[in-house]
Amino acid sequence: MIETPYLLFLGDAPDMLAAKVAIGIRDWRPDHAVGQISLPGCGANLGLTEMTLEEAKAAGAKTLVIGVANRGGKISQEWKKVLVQALEEGFDLASGLHNLLRDEPDLAAVAEATGRTLHDVRVPSVQYPIADGVKRRGKRCLAVGTDCSVGKMYTALAMDAEMQARGIKSTFRATGQTGILITGDGVPLDAVIADFMAGSIEYLTPDNDDDHWDLIEGQGSLFHVSYSGVTMALVHGGQPDALILCHEPTRTHMRGLPDYDVPSLEELRDVALPLAQRANKDCKIVGISVNTQHLGEEEAVAYLKEVEGRMGLPAVDPYRHGAGRLVDALAAV
């Protein structure tokens, strides 16, 4: 059990996208976020109080959460100075990085000496089965994106919150470190051995009531040459009844891949749906979620209207305008 509240460590994140773990906690569990701590040159700012370790401890923070999802998940020497000091100040540490806290000898030694706990949420805690493709009861909705970090998690969380408010049976199913830190449960999909990834999603979304919806957090993109494998596992293992297409319209290239263009929503539709229908022949695309954070209000509304007219599906920014219309669309499934 990870003790709350948290002090969110931003490190030397180059931009806000790199701090998506911290952003997710701030937005969906604000009562868990006491403040932030960053290194010189950090390009991310959550708008929380910038604190020293001593100030955060005095404010009641229990765990220092590494809020940065950097490429490769490595723990730098600059970070370690802060992490060691945090342990010495009485903080537990929590991380979703691929480089595990427990595998860093200096951190492990200090944690043992101080009696603190190292939480690696990207470590699978279950021996997952190989997927068998057997149809399960209940309903499932999966968010798929044109790229990484376009709002797939936010879409699923917003839809789950809206459904809970309406009294509709639903569960957000976390598949990445941010979602796991928000909800306290889930599958760290990109740390699961490849042959068992689809099976882990079957495990995460078991038989349920016929009127219950699993809102499955999407990962990666079918079009991203680095991370498409996890997306395929979700598309097949999740057996979705409904897909939500997710897009960020101001991207000039794929995240971390400057030589690769971002696909259109039409391309995503035409690739994702046949793949999903391989596992569930009745799967439908029911709506579009657009991350309009870099657009002004009028520009965002105009863009959503254009997309809706072009695609023939409800198009919304669930964070900006709510997820009501996306939830309405599920009623027809």
UniProtKB/Swiss-Prot annotation:
<dbReference type="InterPro" id="IPR035086">
    <property type="entry name" value="DgcN-like_C"/>
</dbReference>
<dbReference type="InterPro" id="IPR035402">
    <property type="entry name" value="DgcN-like_N"/>
</dbReference>
<dbReference type="InterPro" id="IPR027417">
    <property type="entry name" value="P-loop_NTPase"/>
</dbReference>
<dbReference type="Pfam" id="PF07755">
    <property type="entry name" value="DUF1611"/>
</dbReference>
<comment type="pathway">
    <text>Amino-acid degradation.</text>
</comment>
<comment type="similarity">
    <text>Belongs to the N-acetyltransferase DgcN family.</text>
</comment>
<dbReference type="Pfam" id="PF17396">
    <property type="entry name" value="DUF1611_N"/>
</dbReference>
<dbReference type="InterPro" id="IPR011669">
    <property type="entry name" value="DgcN-like"/>
</dbReference>
<protein>
    <recommendedName>
        <fullName>D-glutamate N-acetyltransferase</fullName>
        <ecNumber>2.3.1.312</ecNumber>
    </recommendedName>
</protein>
<comment type="function">
    <text>N-acetyltransferase involved in a deamination-independent D-glutamate degradation pathway, named the DgcN-DgcA pathway. Catalyzes the transfer of the acetyl moiety from acetyl-CoA to D-glutamate to generate N-acetyl-D-glutamate.</text>
</comment>
<keyword id="KW-0808">Transferase</keyword>
